[in-house]
């Protein structure tokens, strides 16, 4: 996907998507997939196909559909797209050398929506985006799980100091798995996703340590893929420097969710009736389920829900705005009390 700043205030908008052509009627199928979503429901807007110009007109905004198999096959200037920010969500190219192909094709910046390999910065918007500088042409927005747990771990570590942590993610199945039993290069992932709970690995531990270097060497992690299409759950088992009660940790996290700089990325719920589908299209990177919190002396367990699709996409958009230097005013303005 390519975004470009435009108009008064340098707002950015989607200019084009680059995809592999799957069929002659590919563009119509893409339009249909945008219009209808089995999880999030129908698109709240209009989608029109301009087949002659290979364009989707989304809410009146033309979005060019460019067919290619590699970034170096496209010259963005040929489509009157200049210095765009490219959001690479293929997961195929994850290091600086391969992602640099976008820069060579005319992009000004590249944001990878997967954990990066090598020395590229892994950024969790709202937590460590302050380490960005203008010379960072290629960065990673980490993963949905990393974005879900890093804000929580950062907040807890700042207040209580984490000695050790085990991260267990109960993750909705993804497109990487098989619908029915079939060959898969990964262990266990070849088994049918809608029928099985699948123990697997998670790359979030390494990425968390990159985003929060103070936790390097203190983390372990694993994942269980489960037969649900969306919304995942991160279970954080933490050993702290000091003892804390359930009431104390919940009160602290509630204040973080409502009254700190993390209030737009951390949610907090206090209902004993909450289940996973209640978090479809949740705008938060993660939501603390306070009724599930466990504490015993210096050990706590936190349950954090996250929409691994919508919530993560919102984080990527926030990071893209940051890279594009777009700051929109918050309305209404806060009232200053004397």
Indicate residue ranges for each PLM-predicted region.
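N-terminal Rossmann-like NAD(P) cofactor-binding subdomain of oxidoreductases
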Residues: 1-179, 183-190, 294, 318, ...
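Alpha-helical scaffold segments in soluble metabolic enzymes
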Residues: 1-4, 101, 151-155, 207-214, ...
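Glycine-rich beta-alpha junction loops
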Residues: 19-23, 116-117, 143-145, 169-176, ...
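Short clusters of hydrophobic/aromatic residues that line enzyme substrate/ligand-binding pockets
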Residues: 56, 123, 138, 180, ...
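Conserved active-site and cofactor/substrate-binding residues in soluble primary-metabolism enzymes
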Residues: 81, 97, 143-151, 165, ...
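Catalytic core of tubulin tyrosine ligase-like
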Residues: 161-223, 238
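Short, flexible, solvent-exposed loop/turn segments with mixed acidic/basic and small polar residues
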Residues: 185-186, 224-228, 291-294
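C-terminal active-site/capping subdomain that shapes the small-molecule cofactor and substrate pocket
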Residues: 221, 233-338
């Amino acid at each position: 996907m390519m975004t470009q700043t435009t108009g008064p205030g340098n707002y950015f908008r989607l200019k084009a998507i680059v995809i592999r052509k799957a069929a002659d009627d590919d563009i119509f199928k893409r339009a249909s997939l945008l219009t209808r979503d089995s999880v999030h429901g129908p698109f709240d807007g209009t989608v029109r196909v301009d087949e002659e110009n290979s364009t989707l007109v989304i809410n009146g905004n033309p979005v060019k559909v460019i067919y290619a198999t590699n970034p170096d096959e496209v010259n963005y200037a040929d489509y009157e797209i200049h210095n765009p920010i490219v959001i690479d969500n293929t997961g195929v190219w994850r290091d600086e050398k391969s992602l640099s192909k976008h820069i060579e094709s005319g992009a000004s910046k590249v944001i990878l929506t997967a954990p990066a390999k090598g020395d590229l910065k892994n950024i969790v918007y709202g937590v460590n985006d302050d380490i960005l500088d203008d010379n960072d042409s290629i960065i990673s927005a980490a993963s949905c799980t990393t974005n879900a747990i890093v804000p929580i771990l950062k907040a807890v570590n700042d207040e209580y100091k984490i000695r050790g942590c085990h991260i267990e993610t109960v993750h909705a199945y993804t497109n990487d798995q098989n619908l029915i039993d079939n060959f898969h290069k990964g262990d266990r992932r070849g088994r049918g996703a809608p029928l099985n709970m699948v123990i697997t690995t998670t790359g979030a531990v390494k990425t968390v340590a990159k985003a929060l270097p103070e936790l390097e060497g203190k983390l372990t992690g694993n994942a269980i893929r489960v037969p649900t299409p969306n919304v995942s759950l991160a279970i954080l088992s933490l050993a702290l420097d000091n003892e804390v009660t359930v009431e104390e940790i919940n009160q602290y996290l509630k204040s973080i969710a409502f009254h700190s700089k993390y209030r737009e990325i951390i949610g907090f719920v206090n209902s004993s009736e909450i289940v996973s589908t209640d978090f479809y299209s949740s705008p938060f990177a993660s939501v603390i389920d306070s009724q599930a919190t466990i504490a015993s002396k210096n050990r706590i367990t936190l349950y954090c829900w996250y929409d691994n699709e919508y919530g993560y996409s919102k984080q990527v958009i926030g990071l893209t705005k940051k890279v594009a230097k777009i700051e929109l005013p918050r309305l209404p303005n806060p009232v200053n009390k004397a």
